[in-house]
């Protein structure tokens, strides 16, 4: 659900592990789709300039995690403990010695999810954060990609699933009330079959 702190929790745990050297990995890699413009090659500027609008949420999260430290997100990048990469740039690389956070994974089709998984190299761990109820994908075939992907992961001993519920919403009381009300109405019905499939895998 929206507002449960999925990305915040994942970043906190990853940063705590990297900074305190409690894991063998050396850095954090955040991966995110550039949807609705997956192919960002036509945008002006270098990679940093093209992706800046999508890294802004992480700037805010780092400021919350490190109050009083100027530009903590940029500092982490310059210290080489953090990197950001759009899915468009994943093909052909091998990600080693990293904690990989795939954020907003509900906006990835199966091809993108599959590509990311095949990039994971030695001494790396990968985490997927997302909420299929917030997907920006409109093509039903693309929406079903995450179902197929989770069915594959469900059969792997290396993976575990953590599901957040309505009572886990912490962004605001208003949002929590809204989500609970929305889930009772027709607006959630389009996702009912997806919900049942995913929860059957989690159960």
Which residues are covered by each model-predicted region?
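Conserved P-loop
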Residues: 1-77, 137-155
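Conserved nucleotide-binding/hydrolysis micro-motifs of P-loop NTPases
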Residues: 3-4, 33-38, 89-91, 106-107, ...
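Conserved catalytic network of the ASCE P-loop NTPase/AAA+ motor domain
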Residues: 20-23, 91-94, 108, 118-127, ...
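Loop/turn-to-beta-strand initiation segments
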Residues: 26-27, 79-82, 96-99, 122-128
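Conserved GTP-binding G-domain of TRAFAC-class P-loop NTPases and closely related GTPase folds
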Residues: 47-65, 83, 166-186
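Conserved catalytic/switch belt of AAA+ P-loop NTPases
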Residues: 59-60, 67, 114-127, 131
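Conserved RecA-like ASCE ATPase "motif II neighborhood" in helicase/translocase motors
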Residues: 78-115
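Conserved coupling/interface region of RecA-like P-loop/ASCE motor cores
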Residues: 149-198
